[in-house]
UniProtKB/Swiss-Prot annotation:
Its EC number is 2.7.10.2. Preferentially expressed in liver. Expression is also seen in the hematopoietic cells such as bone marrow, thymus and spleen. Lower expression is seen in the heart, kidney and ovary. It comes from Mus musculus (Mouse). Following B-cell or T-cell receptors engagement, translocates to the plasma membrane where it gets phosphorylated at Tyr-518. Undergoes also tyrosine phosphorylation during platelet activation. Its main location: cytoplasm. Pfam families: BTK (PF00779), PH (PF00169), PK_Tyr_Ser-Thr (PF07714), SH2 (PF00017), SH3_1 (PF00018). Residues 369-622 form the Protein kinase domain. ATP binds at L375, G376, S377, G378, L379, F380, G381, V382, V383, K397. Binds 1 zinc ion per subunit. This is Tyrosine-protein kinase Tec. A zinc finger (Btk-type) spans 113-149. Non-receptor tyrosine kinase that contributes to signaling from many receptors and participates as a signal transducer in multiple downstream pathways, including regulation of the actin cytoskeleton. Plays a redundant role to ITK in regulation of the adaptive immune response. Regulates the development, function and differentiation of conventional T-cells and nonconventional NKT-cells. Required for TCR-dependent IL2 gene induction. Phosphorylates DOK1, one CD28-specific substrate, and contributes to CD28-signaling.
Length: 630
């Protein structure tokens, strides 16, 4: 075994059947787990040929497969699954001890991944469906809650030591296991419950436990301990940019320009992620452009080909780290239009939402809610602006009696609360102990995207519209990655906050509607104009039906809020779409943008791109005008 290898063993893998025509077979493979990948080889250790490799960062779930004494057609009878990208690898171990060892080690390796599934399928995919829930789509959302940290591994007794042999001494534990994890707070956080810990921006904290993806136990410099939101802190490492005020992680070119323009300060700047993974861009504002007018410049941070590599904005001034570049150009323009004078950031201004108001808190006491003005009404009832504990602004949906399948929703709400992303409207909790039930969510100041577009027609640039598409696609890609289907994506179900960020709302809620006019494809309220053929014909929802709806949403955005097929009835739309008719190209959309929409409207689901592919395409379009930097 190689020194860097964690595990190495001959196991049996089942073919992943990535294509419908692929045969189902079971093959013996040498499985090797180093630090960054899971590889499997044909042959033995002496002479082996790699047949496959899975990047550890792409793994979303590792778990034992529940088989209920079903027939396993190979000699190894102890299965576990590795879910990665859009595939599931089933592996069969020769003993329960072997299986437990692999599952435990793999879980340890993926514990810091940001794509861990919320629900998974505990049983095999076989004969065209999952044996646990009988869903027939391979990408169907999981049916059982998945908690990476609640291990299902059985504790097995160690083998009895041989009497005549002396037991070897235990291995010396590696030093790094005892090192403390120190993080830095990026935002202030006020403790709302006794078990919470207050965060002060810029202060350091020691992490004690990570038993929940969204809430970690920590200790401050005074010795106080409690739970903190994990998205409010970042690791204290010299190469971690999150700790710097000038770094804005989730900011595209259009939003960067908007922030810089709002600050309106000479030399205002920020560092943000480039559309090319692993690269960064410096966005810079000057009031005195080349011809005396204000303007923006976007400079790519380049890397040298030397070892160790260096970074630079101006080739003559290369440094060993990005913070060193920024520090240098704060004092020297050196080829830039102006010095980096004033860092512009969202840190400290707009703290991200948290998964609930506190750790393990999803039931909200209605006496803690203050009701204010009405915001609107929808399928489920009236929505009002309110406050929680007279401090935090929230939106409160009062569920009209008979409008929702309440028992099913309450159970699902616990899972939905753990869906947290900057481009999703956060569910904070529910009030279920009285009637009507209340759903408490993040408040979005500018209301629904559809009205936002219609009220400001003629005032949007193409960049601004594309940025809206990017926001929605980021939220939808997160749902896809977590095997969660929206089912009713449209401009009316997206909201806009004060900063102009668009977030996806009401994801998954369509499942709980009891109104036949909305749930039946023949009903007058059924959203036919946003649905692909497999939905209005067979009610087959999947992430690929969400892709179709996303294409229609793009059309809504680039028509500034027009109704799709506005002159046609639902019945006429079904006939037209079935015959291959598609929405026309909006005037504000380029030919290439319209081609992206048409890809979303392919008749067969497998012909449509994934939301991950769409996001990559849109990211490239957003950044395509960045031509500065030499």
């Amino acid at each position: 075994m190689n020194f860097n290898t964690i595990l190495e063993e001959i196991l049996i893998k089942r073919s992943q059947q990535k294509k419908k025509t692929s045969l189902l077979n079971y093959k013996e493979r040498l499985c090797v787990l180093p630090k960054s990948v899971l590889s499997y080889y044909e042959g033995r250790a002496e002479k082996k040929y790699r047949k496959g490799v899975i990047d550890i960062s792409k793994i979303k779930c590792v778990e034992i497969v529940k088989n209920d004494d079903g027939v396993i057609p190979c000699q190894n009878k102890f299965p576990f699954q590795v879910v990665h990208d859009a595939n599931t690898l089933y592996i069969f171990a020769p003993s329960p001890q072997s299986r437990d060892r692999w599952v435990k080690k793999l879980k340890e390796e993926i514990k810091n991944n940001n794509n861990i599934m919320i629900k998974y399928h505990p049983k095999f995919w076989a004969d065209g469906s999952y044996q646990c829930c009988r869903q027939t789509e391979k990408l169907a959302p999981g049916c059982e809650k998945y908690n990476l940290f609640e291990s299902s591994i059985r504790k097995t007794l160690p083998p009895a030591p041989e009497i005549k042999k002396r037991r070897p001494p235990p291995p010396i534990p590696p030093e790094e296991e005892n090192t403390e994890e120190i993080v830095v707070a990026m935002y202030d956080f006020q403790a709302t419950e006794a078990h919470d810990l207050r965060l002060e921006r810029g202060q350091e904290y020691i992490i004690l436990e990570k038993n929940d993806l969204h809430w970690w136990r920590a200790r401050d410099k005074y010795g106080s301990e409690g739970y903190i939101p994990s998205n409010y802190v970042t690791g204290k490492k010299s190469n971690n940019l999150d700790q710097y005020e000038w770094y804005c992680r989730n900011t595209n070119r259009s939003k960067a320009e908007q922030l810089l323009r709002t600050e309106d300060k000479e030399g205002g700047f920020m560092v943000r992620d480039s559309s090319q993974p692993g690269l960064y861009t410096v966005s810079l504002y000057t009031k005195f452009g080349g011809e005396g007018s204000s303007g923006f410049r976007h400079y790519h941070i380049k890397e040298t080909a030397t070892s160790p590599k260096k970074y630079y904005l101006a080739e003559k001034h290369a440094f060993g780290s990005i913070p060193e570049i920024i520090e240098y150009h704060k004092h020297n323009a050196a080829g830039l239009v102006t010095r980096l004078r004033y860092p512009v950031s969202t840190k400290g201004k707009n703290a991200p939402t948290t998964a609930g108001f506190s750790y393990d808190k999803w039931e909200i006491n209605p006496s803690e809610l203050t009701f204010m003005r009405e915001l609107g009404s929808g399928l489920f009832g009236v929505v009002r602006l309110g406050k929680w504990r007279a401090q935090y602004k929230v939106a409160i949906k009062a569920i009209r009696e008979g409008a929702m399948c309440e028992e099913d929703f309450i159970e699902e709400a616990k899972v939905m609360m753990k869906l947290t992303h900057p481009k999703l409207v956060q569910l904070y909790g529910v009030c279920t102990q009285q009637k009507p039930i209340y759903i408490v969510t993040e408040f979005m100041e500018r209301g629904c995207l559809l009205n936002f577009l219609r009220q400001r027609q003629g005032h949007f640039s193409r960049d601004m519209l594309l940025s809206m598409c990017q926001d929605v696609c980021e939220g939808m890609e997160y749902l896809e990655r977590n095997s969660f289907i929206h089912r009713d994506l449209a401009a009316r179900n997206c909201l806009v906050n004060e900063a102009g960020v668009v977030k996806v709302s009401d994801f998954g809620m369509a499942r709980y509607v009891l109104d036949d006019q909305y749930t039946s494809s023949s009903g007058a309220k059924f959203p036919v104009k946003w649905c692909p053929p497999e939905v209005f014909n067979y009610s087959r929802f999947s992430s690929k039906s969400d892709v179709w709806s996303f294409g229609v949403l793009m059309w809504e955005i680039f028509t500034e809020g027009r109704m799709p097929f506005e002159k046609n009835t639902n019945y006429e739309v079904v006939t037209m779409v079935t015959r291959g008719h598609r929405l026309h190209r909006p005037k504000l959309a380029t030919k290439y943008l319209y081609e992206v929409m048409l890809r979303c409207w392919q008749e067969r689901p497998e012909g449509r791109p994934s939301l991950e592919d769409l996001l990559r395409t849109i990211d490239e379009l957003v950044e395509c005008e960045e031509t500065f930097g030499r």
